[in-house]
Amino acid sequence: PEASSPAGAEPLAGDKQQPLGADTSDQRGEQPDPAEDDISPGSELAVAILGRPNVGKSSLLNALAGEERSIVSPVSGTTRDAVDTPLETPDGRKYLLVDTAGVRRRGKVAGRGDPAEQAAVEQSLQTLGRADVAVLVLDAAEVPTAQDFRLAERVAERGLACVLVVNKWDAVEGKGTDTSREFEDRIRQGLRPVEWAPVVFTSATTGQRVPKILDAVSAAGAEYRRRLPTATVNLVIREALAWRSPPGQRGKFGRVYYCTQAATSPPTFVFFVNDPKLFPDDYRLYMERQLRSAIGFEGTSLRLLWRGKPAG
């Protein structure tokens, strides 16, 4: 029978390895890809530049391509009419800007609210399937909008790394010492699905802080591909349980037996528990935030999967 003591009293098997036959697919049928675990941290990062029309995506793309980068000839992408642009920095970092032809083609459409804007946003979203990192471009004059939120939602749903780029920063008047912090707070509040993403304030036309974008992309990509030892993961989870136990339901309490990282790209953690139904959404979000607080993972989505496992 189920004990009624809180989860914090249940020891975690911190050195216990993931059972070989464990089912790591989540309730939506997602399955971590073991092949992604072998990606070298120094390998090419696929980067999708997306955002609403008229936020300066095309100008930003041109600024990135011209910022002391050696540009390889554009190569055909895997989707119709897509052209990808490889870039390499002087220190050897490699990037593949996905569907650069599409970014330029969709750069200017009718004003906000026009059906053409919706179509352009939909086309931008199609590039996410081939990306590791999404660079979501925002307009400093109007952030965040409902379309910005929708794009952020899709980035998180895809499980990508993300960098938020606030373009046209040079056009913001009356900036003070706290202006960027206030903007960043507003952006994080308005774009909750990617509140973990770094924010870069830039101007594509002047080149202000453009190099910082690729620095942020590299850092986010490294976190996206990061793997942790099971013992480290369980140490964090044990402390999180000590601070806050799962809520009980009719005298039954959730127990976490152990947790392991099942995949990277994005980092995917499987919690083996007595009953997944005893862990509501707010508690799952708490666990994600504890992982981020203790370990980092700035700039990347995380996936937390919860699996029922009998005790013993």
Regions found by a protein language model. Give the residues of each.
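Activation of the activation-loop gatekeeper triad in protein kinase-fold domains
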Residues: 101
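C-terminal-of-GTPase-core extension/linker across diverse P-loop GTPases
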Residues: 1-98, 106-122, 126, 130-136, ...
